[in-house]
A protein has these predicted regions:
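Short catalytic/ligand-binding loop motif for oxyanion handling, primarily in non-cytosolic enzymes
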Residues: 21, 51-54, 124-127
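Surface-exposed cleft-lining segments at the edges of enzyme active sites
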Residues: 89-91, 120-123
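Charged helix-capping and loop-helix junction motifs
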Residues: 129-133
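Nucleotide-activated donor-dependent transferases that construct or modify glycoconjugates
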Residues: 4-21, 115-122
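A conserved catalytic-core segment of Leloir-type glycosyltransferases
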Residues: 7-8, 34-115
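Short amphipathic alpha-helix
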Residues: 24-35
Length: 133
């Protein structure tokens, strides 16, 4: 509930993965417990299937372990060898960003979110297209 009101919120949390034993996944589980104890609904969105069934909507384009995401990571931080030139890299990045943006927008809309919490996607440079989307 919002302090002093009876309003329940629909809260979304996004990360590359959820339901795992890494620090971010564990913190997301803690946050969910707190939010739910206050009467809110919590929705998880992740790129990799969770280790346990926790109601996470899986968006494969959000996974950082796929070859497309790894190639974008290399192109952003190391070399354009996977693409040949900057134009091809930019086109691949734009396609990935558009796909993720569409997928995330559909999830946000279908979950009727009031609040969106983005976990580490902007602070960990594993999936540049996810950071842009």
């Amino acid at each position: 509930m919002i302090s002093g009101s009876n309003t329940s919120l629909s809260i979304g949390m996004i990360h590359f993965k959820a339901g795992d034993t890494d620090g971010v996944s564990l913190e997301m589980d803690k946050w969910r417990e707190v939010f739910q104890s206050q009467g809110h609904t919590v929705h998880f969105c992740c790129g990799n299937p969770p280790m346990h069934a926790d109601g996470c909507t899986v968006l494969p384009a959000l996974a950082y372990v796929g070859e497309d995401a790894r190639a974008l990571n290399r192109g952003t931080f190391e070399t354009l060898d996977d693409y040949g030139d900057a134009t091809a890299y930019s086109q691949a990045m734009n396609v990935a960003v558009l796909q993720l943006t569409e997928d995330l927008h559909a999830w946000i809309t279908s979950s009727s979110l009031d609040v969106l919490i983005i976990e580490n996607i902007w602070s960990v440079g594993l999936h540049p297209a996810a950071a842009v989307a």
